[in-house]
């Protein structure tokens, strides 16, 4: 995964479908599971997506995320987020979520 280091880098996303993972703590088991599934999708090139991560607290708070982790899917037409309890998805659920939102 590529690291987003500035807010400008984040704001430039969206021309190509992308997934951004914000602040996934390894101590959160469901979050870690989702992170592992995203990494698997990236390695297997399951989706035509660019994968990013961001752990910079200044960027996270400037985007008004009050809790992490957050997974964001950005396309030229939409931005959808997984937060809080929705972050815990198995591989099939996460795959379905991406498929439902990538073509919008």
Roles of regions detected by a PLM:
Residues 10-12, 61-64:
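Short amphipathic alpha-helix with an adjacent loop that forms part of the alpha/beta core around
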Residues 8, 57-58, 92:
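Acidic phosphotransfer microenvironment of two-component signaling modules
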Residues 46-51, 64:
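Acidic, low-complexity, intrinsically disordered interaction modules
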Residues 24-26, 54-61:
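Structural microenvironment flanking redox-active thiols in thiol-disulfide oxidoreductases
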Residues 2-41:
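Local sequence-structure signature of Cys/Sec-based thiol-disulfide redox active-site neighborhoods
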């Amino acid at each position: 995964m590529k690291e987003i280091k500035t807010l400008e880098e984040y704001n430039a996303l969206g021309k190509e479908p992308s997934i951004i993972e914000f602040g996934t703590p390894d101590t959160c088991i469901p979050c870690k599971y989702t992170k592992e599934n995203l990494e698997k999708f990236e390695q297997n090139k399951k989706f035509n997506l660019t994968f990013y991560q961001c752990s910079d607290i200044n960027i996270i708070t400037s985007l008004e995320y009050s809790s992490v982790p957050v997974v964001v899917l950005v396309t030229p037409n939409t931005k959808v987020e997984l937060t809080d309890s929705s972050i815990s998805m198995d591989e099939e659920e996460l795959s379905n979520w991406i498929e439902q939102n990538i073509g919008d």
